[in-house]
Amino acid sequence: VSDLQIPLNHEVATKNVIKLARREKFDSVLVVGDEIDFQTISKWSEGTPLAYEQTLHADRELTQSILWDLTENAREAHIVRSNHTDRLYNTLLKVPGLMNLPELQYEKFMDFATMGIQFHKTFYEFEKGWILAHGDEGNTNPNPGLTALNLAKKAGKSVVCGHTHKLGLSAYTEGVGANYRTIYGIEVGNLMDKKQASYTKGIANWQMGIVILDWDGKNMTPHMIPINKDGSFTALGKSYV
């Protein structure tokens, strides 16, 4: 699942991805981070009316509801840290006396344990040789797939990430003759409503999408699923409109 940044998510696209998750009952649901925007506690809101909007509780409840709908039919669910969810910790840094309160640790703040979601503070290797990351751990590249591939080269393993809001796959092969290996960098797009992303001023090289991964116990086959601007898409032979 790509960056939602709730409550700035694309409602139709989100509902359709939930329909897909309920229909397919995936073994695992992986969320690349930025599931909640935390816009009222961002550094960009400081000194603006946004910082005084009392929406944090409602945003959290909506995020919990959407994550539950996305993951309730899966055997397991995982989320990795991200720059937007780090905003809670960054806010606590301004009041260090609150930092050790367990209820203000992000995974407890979101009550992931009750939902059966496992939160990872760093890379998560979800299958052998395949890592889930957010995508902000290295330098970003304007070309879809290359931010993930650069992370993959550093990690020595294939990487699935978000952060760039781009949908793309790139690969790198090394070796001699028949003795070679290929690693992949996959960026999963985003599920944001671009109209609500006012900071882009309406112009952004973003693509909505998700990725479905098939693992046969040895090899991974990625299926890139582009999502249209109206929130519709086709996946695994079925259209969601």
Predicted feature locations:
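Polar, enzyme-active/binding microenvironments
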Residues: 9, 23, 223-241
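Acidic carboxylate-rich catalytic motifs and surrounding loops in phosphoryl-/glycosyl-chemistry enzymes
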Residues: 78-84, 119-122, 223-227
